[in-house]
């Protein structure tokens, strides 16, 4: 288990899973919106100096989020997230893949199966993210690409955003 910027990350290579926990000093409703509305997602999802740009977000079961990560030099990496289940202000599950700008999967990168749970706390809320992979090599590839540090940085951005919005 590794704690980075108030983000707890544990890796279970044998079971092909990552578990990320972060607490926020913000009400659950505000945290939920930041995870489910494109205008807010674009402000925190990418680790700086990268930015996230949403092309489309249809947050419903069977819907999708098509976005790109834009680097400081203009490099664009597209991703597609397909929403599977949604329990409003409680949890959602999805599958995320790298794609082209039309949402066609890039099979040279692994799929990530996300389960995100939102829990109210006495000081705000906690988000628990469980990510599973099809095999251990896929998990290793994502880790080698810097996922752990990048996602932790994004969650730090979310902390800043939540403090700045009413």
Where are these regions (language model features)?
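Short coil/turn motifs at secondary-structure junctions
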Residues: 27, 72-74, 86-88, 99-101, ...
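Short, surface-exposed coil-to-beta transition loops
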Residues: 19, 52, 76-81, 110-114
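Glycine-rich portal/gate segments that line the openings of hydrophobic small-molecule binding cavities
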Residues: 53-99
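Beta-strand/loop substructures that line and gate deep hydrophobic ligand-binding cavities in soluble
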Residues: 95, 103-149
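Hydrophobic pocket/interface hotspot
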Residues: 31, 41, 65, 83, ...
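A short, structured loop/turn motif at beta-sheet edges
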Residues: 28-29, 58-60, 84-91, 117-126
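Hydrophobic ligand-binding cavity/cleft-lining segments
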Residues: 1-51
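A conserved amphipathic terminal alpha-helix motif
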Residues: 2-3, 134-166
């Amino acid at each position: 288990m590794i704690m980075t910027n108030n983000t707890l990350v544990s890796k279970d290579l044998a079971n092909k899973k990552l578990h990320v926990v972060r607490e926020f000093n913000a009400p659950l409703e505000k945290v939920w919106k930041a995870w489910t509305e494109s205008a807010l997602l674009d402000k925190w999802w990418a680790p700086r100096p990268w930015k996230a740009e949403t092309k489309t977000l249809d947050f419903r079961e069977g819907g999708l989020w098509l976005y790109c990560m834009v680097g400081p030099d203009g490099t664009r990496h597209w991703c597609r997230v397909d929403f599977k289940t949604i329990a409003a202000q409680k949890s959602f599950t999805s599958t995320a893949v790298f794609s082209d700008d039309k949402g066609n999967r890039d099979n040279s990168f692994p799929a990530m199966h996300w389960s995100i749970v939102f829990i109210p706390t006495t000081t705000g809320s906690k988000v628990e993210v469980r990510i599973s992979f099809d095999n251990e090599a896929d998990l290793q590839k994502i880790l080698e690409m810097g996922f752990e540090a990048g996602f932790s940085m994004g969650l730090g951005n979310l902390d800043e955003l939540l403090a700045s919005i009413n």
